Structures are given as structure tokens and as C-alpha cells.
Design a protein with these regions (language model features):
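Generic hydrophobic, amphipathic alpha-helix propensity
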Residues: 1-6, 22, 47-51, 55, ...
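Helix-turn-helix
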Residues: 4, 8-42, 46
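Short coil/turn segments at alpha/beta junctions that flank glycine-rich nucleotide-binding fingerprints
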Residues: 11-15, 66, 87
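Hydrophobic alpha-helical connector segments
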Residues: 46, 57-86, 139, 143, ...
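Amphipathic alpha-helical packing segments from all-alpha helical-bundle domains
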Residues: 53-56, 102-128, 137-141, 163-166
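Short secondary-structure transition hinges
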Residues: 71, 75, 81-120, 152, ...
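C-terminal peripheral helix-coil segments that are non-catalytic and often amphipathic
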Residues: 82, 117-125, 146-152, 156-191
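Short, hydrophobic secondary-structure boundary micro-motifs
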Residues: 92-95, 132, 183-185
Length: 191
């Protein structure tokens, strides 16, 4: 039932999808659908909770903090975009349909906060010489926002997952390297 709902919501949107259409897609009766979920709103909430959990669990499960910082970044980005590429309907429901609804945007926001927290921890673990005022949380917000924009292109088929991953890795790694610490040697300057 939830798989059918994901497909229908991703194609038609929340407001245009009927319980009749979801029941037909799931090959069950409409009363059976109402028996399990009560209303379209409850069904959509169940879809969001399941899809967010699957997404966060999949990305978290592919993170290995024992890797080098660059390999950790590569692994996280490839995992993130590969999941979206393999679950396009889910992404469309989560980040297009759900975010356009006041009723459900808080659920997506909670999922995004979990990803931002994970990215902030990745940044902290991979930073050798952080500046005292480094705001890993704000950096994570920026990276997740950029990642969502790229993910939207992947989910619509406008971007190849491997090309998009390489672009994100190059962009993020160049920015994350930061400036050298004061203890590293600097080229001699002449006055």
C-alpha cells in the first residue's frame, strides 16, 4: 500500500492523488486502504515517515568514520545521490510534495535536521586544523542545501548520478580543505 502511495503521490502530487487511485495501484479495495490508514492525510504521513527513515538509515549505514576525510566525503556523497537515483519517486514525494504542504513540512524538516547533524559530525571528524570559530552546523546546512539542489536534478533524470557526485565532491573538498594552519610552511615572500 505504501509503495503504491509513493508512486501515485510522486506522479500526481498530494492534492491530485485520490484514495481510489492509490487503492487501484495497490490492487486492494478502497475500504481496505481506509481501514489501515484512516485518511489520505494519515497515509501520506505514513509514507513520509517510512521514506525518511529509509533514506536516513541508508545514508547513515554507508558512512564509515574510519575512512580518510576525502574517502569519507566521497562515500557519503555517492551514497546520498545513489539512494536518490534508485528511489526517485520517494525523493519527489519527500522534497517536492511534502515541502509544499504546511501539514507535512515539519516531518521533512526533522529528516533534514538529521542529515545536517550527520554532515556536521562528518565535517568535524574530517577537519584537521579547525579554526576556533568554525561553525560546522552552518557549514552542514549549506552543504545539505547544495546537495538537495543537485539531488533534485538527479531525481528528475537531468543529471547523471556519478557526474553529479564528482561535481559535489570537487566543490565540497575544495571548500572544506580550508586554509593551511599557522604551523604549516608558507612560501617565502620578499619585501
Amino acid at each position: 500500500m505504501l509503495d503504491a502511495a509513493v508512486q501515485m503521490f510522486s506522479v500526481n502530487g498530494y492534492h491530485e492523488t485520490s484514495m481510489d487511485a492509490i487503492a487501484a495501484e495497490a490492487e486492494i479495495s478502497k475500504p481496505m486502504l481506509y481501514l489501515y490508514y484512516g485518511s489520505k492525510e494519515e497515509l501520506f504521513g505514513a509514507v513520509l515517515n517510512r521514506e525518511l527513515s529509509r533514506f536516513v538509515d541508508a545514508v547513515r549505514g554507508d558512512i564509515d568514520f574510519t575512512l580518510s576525510p576525502k574517502d569519507l566525503l566521497r562515500n557519503a556523497v555517492v551514497s546520498y545521490l545513489s539512494y536518490i537515483d534508485a528511489n526517485r519517486a520517494s525523493w519527489i514525494v519527500l522534497y517536492t510534495q511534502a515541502t509544499s504542504s504546511q501539514t507535512f513540512s515539519h516531518t521533512v524538516r526533522e529528516g533534514r535536521e538529521k542529515i545536517v547533524d550527520l554532515v556536521a559530525r562528518l565535517l568535524q571528524s574530517g577537519t584537521r586544523n579547525p579554526q576556533p570559530d568554525t561553525d560546522f552546523d552552518m557549514m552542514a546546512v549549506a552543504l545539505v542545501g547544495a546537495g538537495e539542489a543537485v539531488a533534485n536534478s538527479v531525481s528528475t533524470g537531468d543529471a547523471d548520478v556519478h557526474d553529479a557526485a564528482q561535481l559535489m565532491i570537487n566543490l565540497f573538498w575544495g571548500g572544506l580543505k580550508g586554509k593551511p594552519s599557522d604551523t604549516q610552511t608558507h612560501p617565502a615572500t620578499t619585501a
